[in-house]
Each structure stands twice: as C-alpha cells, then as structure tokens.
Amino acid sequence: MRTLLPPVGSEVFRRFTQSSLNEIQQKQQIREEERKRTNAQVSEELPEPASDLEAGKPLPFIYGEPPHELLNVPLEDIDPFYQSQKTFIVLSKGNIIYRFNAESSLYLLSPFNALRIVAIKILIHSLFSLFIMATILTNCAFMTLSDPPAWSKTMEYVFTFIYTFEATIKILSRGFCVGKFTFLKDPWNWLDFMVISMAYLTELVDLGNVSVLRTFRVLRALKTITVIPGLKTIVGALIQSVRKLADAMVLTVFCLSVFALIGLQLFMGNLRQKCVLIPQWLYGNLTFDINSTNGYYGNDTHDNGTKSKHLEFEFERHINNPDNYYYLTGQGDPLLCGNSSDAGVCPESYVCLKVGANPNYGYTSYDSFGWAFLALFRLMTQDFWENLFQLTLRTAGKTYMIFFVVVIFLGSFYLINLILAVVAMAYAEQNEATLAEAKEKEEEYIHILEALKKREEEQAARKEPHSTVEGFEDDHRLCPPCWYAFANIFLKWDCCGCWRHLKECLYAIVMDPFVDLGITICIILNTVFMAMEHYPMSADFEELLSVGNLVFTGIFTGEMVFKILAMDPYFYFQVGWNIFDSIIVTISLVELGLANVQGLSVLRSFRLMRVFKLAKSWPTLNMLIKIIGNSVGALGNLTLVLAIIVFIFAVVGMQLFGKNYKDCVCRISEDCVLPRWHMNDFFHAFLIIFRVLCGEWIESMWDCMEVSGQTMCLIVFMMVLVIGNLVVLNLFLALLLSSFSGDNLTTQDDEGENNLQIAINRINRAMSWTKTYILLYVYTLTESNLNQHFAVSDDEEQRRVKDILALTSVSSDKLVSHHCGNDFFRVPIAEAESDSDDSDYDEDKDSQCDESSVCSSVQKPEVQEEEMDENCVAKTPTDCWTKKCYSRCPFLDIDTSQGRGKIWCNIRRTCFSIVENNYFESFIVFMILLSSGALAFEDIYLEKHQLIKSILEYADKVFTYVFVMEMVLKWFAYGFKSYFSNAWCWLDFLIVDVSLVSLTANILGYSELGAIKSLRTLRALRPLRALSRFEGMRVVVNALVGAVPSIFNVLLVCLIFWLIFSIMGVNLFAGKFSYCFNETSQEIIDTKVVDNKTECIALIKANFTEVRWKNVKVNYDNVGIGYLSLLQVATFKGWTDIMYAAVDSRDVESQPIYEVNLYMYLYFVIFIIFGSFFTLNLFIGVIIDNFNQQKAKLGGQDIFMTEEQKKYYNAMKKLGSKKPQKPVPRPENPFQGLVFDLVTKQIFDVFIMVLICLNMVTMMVETDEQSDKKEEVLYWINVVFILIFTTECTLKIIALRRHYFSIGWNIFDFVVVILSILGLLLADIIEKYFVSPTLFRVIRLARIGRVLRLIRGAKGIRTLLFALMMSLPALFNIGLLLFLIMFIFSIFGMSNFAYVKKEALIDDMFNFETFGNSMICLFMITTSAGWDGLLSPIMNTPPDCDPNVENPGTTVRGNCGSPAIGIAFFSTYIIMSFLVVVNMFIAIILENFNVATEESSDPLCEDDFEMFYETWEKFDPDASQFIQYSKLSDFCDTLKEPLRIPQPNTIKLISMDLPLVPGDRIHCMDILLALTAEVLGDSDEMDTLKATMEEKFMANNPSKVSYEPISSTLLRKEEEVAATVIQRAYRKYLLLRTVRLASFMYREKTEGRGKEKAPETTGLLCKQFSQLYGFNKETDEPLQSKANRLGQVELQSEVLLHAVPPLRSSEFLQERDQRETSV
C-alpha cells in the first residue's frame, strides 16, 4: 500500500479522456515491441493488483476526498497494475471504486459515448442498488404466497422487466462478454442471465411442467448476494470448504457403500417379517414355513388338490390383509418379528411371516442397495436411528447390535466429524490468511500515517486550514458537531455547587462495592422469585410473587435513577451495562403499566434479561456473552447466507411439493387432514427446512416421497442436508470454536478485581479480624484459668498467641488452595516409619511417591511424577495417624523398636508386603471383575433360577469378605492417614461399606426395607474400583479431572442460559398442556364437546369413567420440568411432542386446538439456535481446548494414551524409517518368469481393481425376491469373479512363491478367496441341510472383503484411515471408560426400572429387565437417541400404571416408575456420555485428522517414501543399501514426482553434493535426504526432518555405520574440473615454450645471434614435451593418441589433484561457460 501513496503535489484523480486512452495504447504498443525484441514476457515485471483498490471497495483514505465534480465520471485508473491496461475507474458518491473496460461496449459504445456514460451513472448510483434490492425482496415476498392472487402474474412481468432493465444497464456500461470487466466475466452475473433467460423461456415456450420451471424463479433470491458485497466473500469461503470435502466425501460414500452391502447381505427382506394372525380354519391343516412367502405346506391331498388350491388362495388373501397383522397401540406399522432365538416374538395366536410391505410406507428396508444405502446414511447422520435399530434387532436378533456399534462409531463419530474437521480447517486457513493480511496492512498504514504527518507539517508550514489527518478524524466522528453542543448543554448537569456536591455523594454511594453486592443479591433473588412461578399456584403465593416483582422493579428503577443523577446522562449512557439496565428497567415499567392488556404478557419475559447482569461480576458468564457476541458479529454474513438458503429451499419445497401435499394428503393422513409437517404454505415449508438443519430429515422425507415421488424429494432433502447441515452449520461451529480458547473461560486477572470481589474481600477481612479477636479473647480466658494450675512462661505464651494470629490471618483462599490442591488426588504410599519432626505436608509429599499402590492415582496431568521420586523410599509403612492425633492421644505413639511395638511393626510390614505384591493386586482386580460380573446376573429372572440366586448370594458374601479383608490389610499397611487422604481409597471404602451394610441387613432379615434396597443399588458403583487398576482408563480419567473445572463452568453457564428459556416457557405454557382424554378410544375429546377442565371434570362426575383430564408428561408447569423439556428440545428427542402441545395450547386449563397458537414454533426455533447450537457446542469447544492445554503442559504428549500405546502411536507416525527390501527375484523357470512378468505389471493391478469395482456393482444390483433368472445370472457372475480372483491368487503364488505370503495385502487377498470359495460351497449345504439364514448371510459377507481392496489404491482414503489408525489407542481407552459408564448405569437401571410398564420404547426387547437389554438401551441413548421414549414409561404414576400389579416369578409388585430417579438417571447419563465422553471421541478424531492432513498436505508423504524404496529395489536387487554412482542419473529419472529429477540431470545431481563411499557407491539414505531437501528447500524444519530420518534409519539399519564417505559427487566433479584446467594450462605453457624455442632456433639459423643464450629450461621442457607428446619415429604415432595412452594417468597425480582449491558447483559452471566462450 505504500506504493499507492500519491506523491506530494501530484494530481491523483485525472479524467479519463481520449488522450488517456491513446497514452495507454502507446504504452501497450511499446511493451509489445519490447516483448518481441527481447522475446520475454514484460507482463511478469508488472506489479500485482492492489487489494485495497479492487472494484467494489471504498477508496482508501490516503487518497483524500476526491473533488465533487470528479464523482460519477470516468477517471484514469489509480492502480499501478491497471495503468498500462485499457481500464478506467468511476467513483460513486460513497467513494466506492467501479472499474470498467476502456474498449467499446458491444463494439459500439466507446467510454466517451453519452449513452454508456448515462448507463454507468445509473449503475453506480446507490438508489439503483436499493431499488434492485427492494425489487428482489418484494419478489421474494410474492414467492412465499402459496395461493397468489390473479394480479401476481402482472407483477411477474414487472419483475422480469426490472431484471431485464438491470442487465441491460450492466451490459451497456460494461460490455457483454469480450474483455476483463464485462458482464459475463463476473460469475454472479451468470445467475442474473440464467434467471432472466428462464423467465422468458417459461413465457414464450411451452415447456410442460410449469411448477418445476417456476421454482427457478427462487434463484432470484441469490441476487441478494450480488447486491450485498460482504456475502460474496462468505459464499467463496463456503465453496472452498466444499472443494476440500472431496476426500472426506469419497471416504464417506465408500464406507457407506460397504456398510450398505453388509446390511444388504445380512438383513435383506427381514423388515417384511410381521406377526400374522393364524386363521382358525387352518389349525392342523398346514405346516408353516417361516422362510417362505406363502408360509405353509398343505397336509391334505384331495382330488386334483382342489382343496389345497382353495386353501392356498384363502391363505394368500388372509396373510396379505393388513387387518390380520398385529399392531401396537398408537403405531401405524404392524409389529415386526424374527425367527432367530434372540429376535422379537409374536403374541399368542400369531405367527411370524414374511409378507406385506416394509415399514414407513415401504421406505425403510435393506431389500436393495439403494434402500440399504439410505438406511445406513440415516444411521450415520443419527436421524431417528433408534427406530431402525429396533426394527432390525427385532427381526434379525440382538446379536446384530455389533453391526450398529461399528457403524455408529466409524460412520457417525468418525466420518461425520471428518466433515466438521475439513470445514473447520478451511475456515481456519482463511482466517489465518485474513489475519496475516490485516497485520501487513497495519504495518503499511503505520508508514502511510508517517508520510501523512510529514505532509501535514508541510501543509501547516504553508498555513493550510485542514490536514489530511484532521479531515480523516473529523470524518470519523460519531455524530455531527451540533449534537455534541446539544449534549454539552442538556446531558451534562452542572448547575451549581450544591448540586455538584449532591452528585458526588450519590456517586460515592452508587459506586460503592457494597451497593453492587446488594444489587447482585437482588438480581439473584429476583431470578429465584421468577423461577418459583409454577402451575397450579395459590392466590397468596401469586400475590407474594407479584409484590416481589414490584419491589425488585422499584429497586432497579431507583438504582438507574441514582446512577443517572450521579453520573449525568451523557456519561451514564457511555457504559454498555448502563444502557442494558435502562432498557430492562424501562420494559419492566411498561409491563407494569400494561399488565392487564391481553397478549402483552410476553413483556414479562424481558425481566429475565436481568440475569445477564450477573456477568458484570461473573467472569465466565461475561466471557461467554462476549464469545456469543463476537461469534454473532462474525456470523452476520453467514447467518444471512443461511437465511437465504433456508428461504430458497422453503420456496422450492412449497413450489414443487405444496400442491401434492394437498392433493395426496390421504396417503399420509388417515383423516385426510394435512399433517403438522407439510409444505403447502411457506411457514410450514420453512419449519421443515429448519427441522432438516437440526438433523431430522428422514420422517419429513418419507411423507414427501409418498405424496410427491421419490426422486425429486430425495434430491431436495439431500441438498438441504449436505449444504445446510453438513457445511453451513459446521462452518457455524467452526466460527464459534474459533471465537474462544480455554483461557477465555478462566478469570482474567489482568483486568483487576471487580466491585463484587472487593466487597467480598472486605467481608472476609472483617470476618477474619473478628474471628482472630474472638479466638484471642477465648484463649486469654482459658489461659488465665490454666495459669492458676500450671506455670507457663511469658515467652511461650507470646509464641502461642503469635501462632494463633498467624493461623487466623491466612485468607480463606489460601486455606482452600492448600487443602484442595493436587495432593488430594495423589496416591498415598506408605514408607518407612520415622519419628522425625517433619511437617504433615512433607510427610504427605513423601508418602505419595510409589505408583504401585492399589488405590491408584488420579493425579492431574500437569504434576510431574519425576519431581516426587527423588526423596522416595516407599519400602516400609508410614505412620498410621497424623501428628495431631499423636499429640492429642500420646498412647498411639508406640515404640516400634521393642516389645509389642516391634510385633505391631512386623505385622504392618507383613501387611505392606502383601498389599504391594503384584499377585495380590491381580487377585483383587480379578475379584472386582467377578463381583461386577455377578451384578449382571441379578435380573428379573433370578427368582426363577434359585441355584444361580444361591450361588450369587454366597459369592456376594465372599466378595464382601475379600474386599473387607483388603481394606483392613491396607489400613494396617498404609495407616489411616495415608488411606483416608486419597480419593480412590475413599471410593473403595464407601463401596465396601455399602456391601457390608447390605450383607448385615440380609443376615438380620432387614433386606426388604426400602432404605436397604436403595442402598443395594449403590453396589452398581462397584466397577468404579476398576478405574484405578487399568492404566488405559486411568489416563482418560486423569485428563477428565483436569477438564472438570472448565466443563463445570460451561455447564453452569448453560443452566443460566436455559433458566431464562425455562422461566419464559413457564410464563407462556404453564397449565396449558392439559387435555380431556378418552381412555377407551385413546383420543382427545373434541373442543366442541369439552372446552376446558371444568367441563371435563363435570363429564367425569357424570359417571364417564373412561374420561380423564390428563397433562403432557413433559411440560412447562414449573422451572424444573421446564429444564427437562429444554433438554429434550436441545437433543432433538421428544421435542416434536412438546412443540405440538405448545402450538395447540390456548389458555390455562383449556382444551388444545390444532395449531391455534402457530407462531409458538418460533420460541423453539430461537431456543434451538441459542440454547442448542451455541451452548451445547461450547462443550465440544471447551473439551477440545482444555485437552490441548493439558497436552501443551505435558510437552505435546498425548494425554489419552499409556506409555505402551504411545509407542504404537509413534510407530504409526514414522516417516522415512523404512529400509530397502530385497525385491522378489524373478524365477528362473521360463513359465514362472512369464507369470512373474504378468503379475508385476501395473496394468495387471489396474485390471484387478476394475474387476473389484465390477464385482461391487454386481453385488449392488442384488434385491430381495428377485426373479429366478436374475438370481441364476448373479450366481454365475459371482462364480466367475471367484474363479478370476482365485486365478489371480494362484498366478501370484506361482510367480512369487513363498514371497507371496510376506506381503500383508496378499495374505488378505488369500483369506478373502478362501472364504469366497467356502461361501460358494457351503451355501448349498446350508440351504439343503440347515435352516440357519444367519450363518448363510455371514458366509456371504466374505464377498465384501474384495471391495476393501480398493483402499489399497486410493491415497486420499488411506490418509483418512491412517488418521483413524492413529486414533485407535486413545479411542480404545475412551471406549473402555464409556463401557464402564454403560455397565454401571445398566446395573442401576436393572435395579430401578426392571418392572416398569411396557409402553413407548420399552417393550419385550428394549427394557431394563436383563443386563443385555439394558446395555442395548444405553448404547442407543449414548447418542441421545430415543431417551425420551425410555423415560416416558418410567415417569408413569397412578392411574397411568398400577402399583399393585403382580409380576410373575417375583415378589416385586407394581409397574410404576420413579419420575425423579428416572429424570436424574437419564439426564446424568446424557451429560456424561453424549456431552462429555462422545465429545472426547470428537476431540481425538479432530486432532489426529489434523496430524494426518498436515502429513498428507506436505510436499512429501509416506507414499512418496514408499515409491522411493520400490524404485530402489530395482536398482539394488541385493538390498545392499548402495548403488553405483553411474546408475544415479537413471535412478533419479525413474522416480515419480515429486522426488523425480528428469534427465538430463547430471549437473543437478552433481550440485546436490552426495557422499561417495569406496567403489564409487552412494547410500540410499543420502540420496533420499538430498531429494527431500530438493523438494522441501532449506529450512530449520528440514534440518530437523533430516536429523530425525537419519536417526530412525540408523536405528533400523546399523549397517550404515561401517561405511564412511571418502568423497562426494560435487568434490569428484571439482577434482575432474581442476585436473582438466591444470592439464590445459600446462599444455598451453609447454606449447608456448616450444614456440619460443623454435623462434630462438630460427633466429640462430637465420640471424646467427651467437651471443643470445639458449633457454635451457625451455629446451629441457620441450624435450620432455617431445618425449611425452611428440611423434614416435618408429611407429609415427600421432601426438593425441600418445597423449591418450600415457598422459592421463601420469598427470592426475595427488599433487595435481589437490594443488588447486576446490571449486563449488556455481564457480565450476561459471568457469566452464567462460572457457567455452573464449574457445
């Protein structure tokens, strides 16, 4: 930008005239001639376009204000880049830059043409943009009309005319398509062109389906992007994100395809298995075949089978009649069933047959690849997957839960979060680039301002009235000067001295910290008062809350008034919090005045905003509000883009499907009334699109496909899901996560203490002072009494007083930090008993060193164990008691050197050696596992198996005795002090106590008491003891303990946020969700019959016993249950029922009417945006960031892996650590050699890959109940593929011999081939002799193994799977922790919910009756799926359940649940699993994805090193690690990019200076390092990489150590060049001497100069030269030939080689060029 600063005195803005155009043309002509003359590209020397002078941006302030007469007229371009091109600029009124071509527009209109100038003026005018924007918005409003009026057609013509006029103006001013800044060169103008073209097409040409074409009009909404400049940028970022999704999308589609194929093979046709009523006339006549569609064999053989045919016809009609299927209450689809042992069973009189259609209109099935793919995609996106899970397990069996576990963990947790990672990374890169650009601009602006200051000084010297900087500052004042004058007069109140004195007094009061404390307490009390509102309330309580509201409103009003008086309005409203206070107080006062006005009760909700005032004194809440504020600011454009996307898809849905919903409504609704989710009008279409953005799309899509056809609905819904949910919302999340770091969620000490902290500190100091003097007074009284009996010296007394004062003067903060530090989490380990006088703290520190303790550590990660190990002996027990205990009870201090004390010491040492023994540790772990496993058997069937019950009772006693024994041994070994100072030992102690109390109660016969039963459920915590014993789980818990403060902070803030929405929900919906219900017909009584509760109660009193006034279980009757409602809405489970009740609600105790309160949907929309999108995603952010902080404190080590797992992780990350392998030798046998050549060619691998793809396609076309012909064709195709792959396997074994099994992929291929052959052979046997379709299906899965071979050839997929492999150790540890949590909650669920009534999602398969069923339910709700359906029956209370009903086989009575326990159980599990543990999965996957992406985005990756060594094998068949120097050129040419150096490459290789070892050989690592440096360049990172690679290679290949280089390629070349130079110089010298001698001899002969001495040296040299290079008289051998024979060896002596300094490569090349030039 410094280059853009115009020189002083220069004319910056010049009109664009004909002479300007001629000047540009002259410059272009000169440049063209120069280019032709020098044959070089002059354009390369031109500067880059200035980013600040781009079209559409405002003119930088450094150019000053352009003269008014130069606005809206063509000017010469001020960008140096364009000054030599045919362009000009126009500045609009707001100094916005517009750039145009100087060429003639449409070959007709020059830049100086009047028409074009008018068009330009219209185009750049702000009113024109506003007019177009208003037109677009009006057009959008018309598009939302589902039933437009007749005159709307006229409006369409008007809109089309306006858009045509806009395009015409653009084309006239810019040109159409030829030139850089013409109309069609801007991609956004393509949109305009397409919109206008489609408008004319639909009017002029009859194209059939007009409704489809009319939807193209919605693209006009995208024109807003072209009008609002900021939107183009964010759309560009979105497009970049989508481009980067390529690999992740490919991997996702591939994995989904594989899973869909597995689902197709395992579950094809299963979901058609239904419970069909057995007709009475068929009993005894037929035998049912469960696998046949007919389902029977006839037993009767009458004449010509007449009766059998009749029965066949009747039976066929019977089983295809939906009325004969079994339906559960409230379900539209019949009950599914299966025929395996663990599948769902049919009720009595029903049989399981495969008949009828699939569930959900037939769209949920695995019957073909397409439907299976849709089902798996639904499973991956976790939309209503609990339904698919239940249907599949009910038909196939519970064993297949494994399939769902794999798909959820791989597909949902991994693949979906890969998309998040890619989008987040794309945003991060863009953000970094923006920040870098901003930093660069900042530096440039500093220089610019310096230049402006100099200019200002010059202007001041010339006495100019206004400088540039002053002008700039004046321009940036917020208000006109008149407003400042008004403010000084009316908003600053300085009347007289007494008024100022009053103000000072008021200021001192309102700014006092204690006043702030009082206001904060009032805010909290006000919030409590608002939260106490509930339904039903007594009149007195309601009056109390009303008075409380008046009081608090008065207090806050008074605070505002006093602050305004104290600070003056001018300064009061300068503070943001004061503005906020004034708004809330004003609304509160308005609400009081309008309290009785109907419909304005929503104003009461604004009082809730006072809660945010807590942020002034609560740093975490303040930071969260700032985060949301920053995010909303950054999300402004993105929100607008999302709104446009939602609008477009809503209009598209309404235009395409709205009419179909109305016409075909009977297909999806029994009473032919539009369902709640439809697209017949814009508002409902908007709700469906918003629901899809929330992740719920499948149910709406089923309805759409049923009424409008499958293809179009699939396309629209998939587009909304991918664009809206996966891209835009993930970008929202990326922006949110980038808005904060973990440091933001901690108190900012730099800002100093706020008033609240000052007030609290004052109170603490006052309390401390009071406490000190009370203690001193008490001490004085007691001492005076004691001194009468004991003589105490004054010095000792003074020392005690000082101790008391010192103790009490410690602040509470320090006391807390001392007692709640990391030491509480350390492991107490006993060490040698000592009588030393060290402090307790030092003893604790010394006693916490050994990690072998049974109560293992939950040490925070940042504590380094090495620091503690220096002083540790830890071989003998520590003291039993603390020093205080010994001082208070001296008899505890026993002399351990003699007598009983010595015996006691020996006993302790024996106990210590026992508990420290590894065998004891292993035994205890084994007992923990056994005791935990025993809990799993205590299900509802235990009473039926008395033997197992007896065994479990005895085992429980044994476990209790063993754990008591372990506890006592540890008491003896470690002492009470060490044992009870450790959290894990406390946990052990409490769990043992529970078992002990339970056992004692059983022995005494009190086991049936309610309290004892409740206590027994706590035995479910027994598996927690395993946490400290398994290192993998322990490291995860360590990380979690470190994250707990941040998680708790976010949880607390979320609760505050949700409190506002919960209180608002109570205000809006309390008492309005009830309805009058007919228990017999299971229907709500119509409002025409019963209008409210009073009428319903009257109906009940009139002996209508089947009628009940019921309430929705999850409602807003109080704040507590409101929280539960919000949790269901935030997790999108059960939220639709709550919304339905809300939009149907009228008044308190009134019957609901269908969608009477339609716009209450907006309450839920707003909560989902702020309560779900923001707050729940904060959990992800804080967990990721906290773990990153912990990792940084540990020096970058992974906090989720044990030391052994870190070794695996590092092995996975090794780069370049391979060594050359000896290639498989070509067989000598000619036939084998021929086969070897075939299988090692690349074309062979390509051919096999193509066949694998074809095999995948053939598997995809398989369907349920396909024709016999198709089945036979597919069978033989499968046989052909098996033969081909078997042939491939055989050929490779023949060619590679034993080496075949040394390659992992070959072993995989071999296993797949064997399994395929077994599947082919066993299929017939299984079909003939067994009736086990499960085994048959599992065998067929082997075919899918072939598809996985595609991974071998897909680099991008391998990179992403490599990230997964790196994540496995940490994921395994977190999986273990998740399993432990599920195990504990399963046991707890079995204890409390085993007998609840079967309704909603609890049925005969999904319940808490057995451990297996509990685990299935908990796995389902780990993703939050279906937890509302499991909670609903548990919340049943009489009369919805019967507390006295008998449960067969047990003494337990009743089928009611416990609402309080159920809510606590599910809420806790959702928070622990869904919000914490699952987010830990996400954190690890994102981190390892980043690592893998960085490696794959590097210029070099693992594949390149692999390619290097594969090529090396061809040049070094013996794997000696060396090749000849002569082969180097060919080797480097044979390599593939990026390592390849194509021939001719001799000079390049010489300049790389590769070390040579004896024998002119080069080592592979030296070549690899040199090539790597060539690709990456020289940098510190390169040096580090070199060192790492060399170190790894040396470790793997010690053979390199014995070879030391004696030279290098560059040195060798330098030696050769030096020798050549010396040879040439020497020959030249000899030749010169020879000429001189010849001249001397000639002169002697002709002139006879006898006095001249002959040059003897020269003569001697000439003689030598003659001997060396002269003619041999005997053979007449030429000079050159003799030189070749003798000279080379003799001249290349060591003296000559080292007589000259070595030349570097550049010097050598220079010298060579000089020599060649001179020659």
Swiss-Prot record:
Outline the segment boundaries, as ranges, of region: Disordered. 28-50, 834-862
Q: I repeats: which residues?
A: 108-431
Q: In terms of domain of life, where is this protein from?
A: Eukaryota
Q: Which residues lie within the membrane without crossing it?
A: 369-393, 682-702, 1120-1141, 1411-1433
An annotated GO cellular component of this protein is: voltage-gated sodium channel complex
Instruction: List where the protein spans the membrane.
Output: 127-145, 153-173, 188-205, 212-228, 248-267, 401-421, 514-532, 544-563, 578-597, 600-617, 634-652, 714-732, 920-937, 951-969, 984-1002, 1011-1029, 1047-1066, 1159-1180, 1244-1261, 1273-1291, 1304-1321, 1335-1351, 1371-1388, 1463-1485
The reactions it catalyses are:
Na(+)(in) = Na(+)(out)
Q: How does it sit in the membrane?
A: Multi-pass membrane protein
- Alphabetized InterPro entries for the sequence: Ion_trans_dom, Na_channel_asu, Na_chnl_inactivation_gate, Na_trans_assoc_dom, VGCC_Ca_Na, Volt_channel_dom_sf
- For the Extracellular compartment, the record's topological domain ranges are 146-152, 206-211, 268-368, 394-400, 533-543, 598-599, 653-681, 703-713, 938-950, 1003-1010, 1067-1119, 1142-1158, 1262-1272, 1322-1334, 1389-1410, 1434-1462
Instruction: Family membership, please give it.
Output: Belongs to the sodium channel (TC 1.A.1.10) family. Nav1.4/SCN4A subfamily.
Q: What is known of its domains?
A: The sequence contains 4 internal repeats, each with 5 hydrophobic segments (S1, S2, S3, S5, S6) and one positively charged segment (S4). Segments S4 are probably the voltage-sensors and are characterized by a series of positively charged amino acids at every third position.
Query: What name appears for this protein in its UniProt entry?
Result: Sodium channel protein type 4 subunit alpha B
Which species is this record about? Takifugu rubripes (Japanese pufferfish)
